[in-house]
């Protein structure tokens, strides 16, 4: 069964997706950590809103699970503009890019996840769109071919990447705002765990939040995943409250060690060190 079919037919997976979406912050004030980036975005958003302009194109880099997609959605929410999302691998032909760009409303946020996986041949399609809000399209073939230039509304391209080095310099330089998200401190992750527990209506003690945060490898996505697994353990084996003891017991059962590494992580590290 394909992943798409499984998601259509399995209510549990759909419910899990809905839960994950409900944990995403919706406004900058709700976003924990990355203080410098939050301030930079707040200033840029307020300035472009006052001018009535589209926000400069934004490149968000960093490891998976740090909040790049959430920030892109937050930018659109703060600007009160439409949010359109796709991914680099999904754009295979110039027609795919043209279909998205020509459908954008003024000042829309167009989010391209994994932008480093965008085919090189398509990068040049973005250059005039990003700089001049124009999209040259070749109509016809052979000697009768001609170029028609489509006018585009001002928009903001938000690119997310885990591998900045794979972006070409011409594409990277066209992003007016470039930022890198860094791993979160344990205290920040504890705040995120407490917020998620409140949304999910999980009984949580502060020491339980800190215990989960300490093993989350600096990543909110990991913290939220561990919180849900510890919740399950606390409901079945404990009194239903996520305490430090419940977190310790649950994470031991899951074979997650003090550094946040599970058994597969340790096996991979062992294999690397054994070479």
Model-derived features: positions:
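Pre-Walker A (pre-P-loop) alpha-helix and adjacent loop at the N terminus of AAA/AAA+ ATPase modules
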Residues: 15-63, 98, 207, 212
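C-terminal engagement/docking regions of AAA+ P-loop ATPases
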Residues: 2, 7-13, 22, 245-275
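Conserved AAA+ ATPase core "coupling" helix
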Residues: 166-214, 224-225
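C-terminal helical "lid" of AAA+/P-loop NTPase domains
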Residues: 209-215, 221-236, 267-270
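Conserved AAA+/SF3 P-loop NTPase catalytic/coupling segment centered on the Walker-B
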Residues: 75, 94, 108-138, 164-174
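Short amphipathic alpha-helical elements of helix-turn-helix/winged-helix folds
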Residues: 44, 233, 271-275
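AAA+/SF3 P-loop NTPase mechanochemical coupling elements
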Residues: 140-160
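Walker A/P-loop
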Residues: 46-88, 98-106, 127, 162
């Amino acid at each position: 069964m394909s992943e798409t079919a499984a998601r259509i037919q399995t209510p549990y997976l759909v419910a899990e997706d809905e839960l994950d979406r409900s944990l995403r912050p919706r406004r900058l004030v709700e976003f924990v950590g990355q203080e410098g980036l939050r301030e930079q975005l707040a200033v840029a958003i307020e300035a472009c809103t006052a001018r009535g302009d589209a926000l400069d194109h934004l490149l968000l880099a960093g490891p998976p699970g740090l909040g790049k997609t959430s920030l892109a959605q937050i930018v659109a929410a703060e600007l009160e503009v439409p949010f359109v999302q796709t991914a680099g691998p999904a754009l295979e032909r110039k027609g795919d890019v043209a279909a998205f760009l020509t459908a954008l409303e003024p000042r829309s946020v167009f989010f391209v996840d994994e932008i480093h996986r965008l085919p090189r041949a398509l990068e040049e399609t973005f250059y005039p769109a990003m700089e001049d809000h124009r999209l040259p399209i070749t109509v016809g073939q052979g000697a009768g071919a001609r170029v028609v230039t489509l006018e585009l509304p001002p928009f903001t391209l938000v690119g997310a990447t885990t591998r900045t080095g794979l972006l070409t310099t011409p594409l990277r330089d066209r992003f007016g705002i470039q930022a890198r998200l860094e791993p979160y401190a344990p205290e920040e992750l504890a705040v995120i765990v407490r917020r998620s527990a409140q949304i999910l209506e999980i009984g949580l003690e502060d020491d339980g939040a800190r215990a989960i945060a300490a093993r989350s490898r600096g990543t909110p996505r990991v913290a939220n995943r561990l919180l849900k697994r510890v919740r399950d353990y606390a409901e079945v084996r404990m009194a239903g409250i996520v305490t430090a003891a419940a977190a310790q017991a649950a994470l031991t059962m899951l074979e997650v060690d003090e550094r946040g590494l599970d058994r597969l992580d340790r096996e991979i590290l062992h294999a690397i060190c054994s070479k």
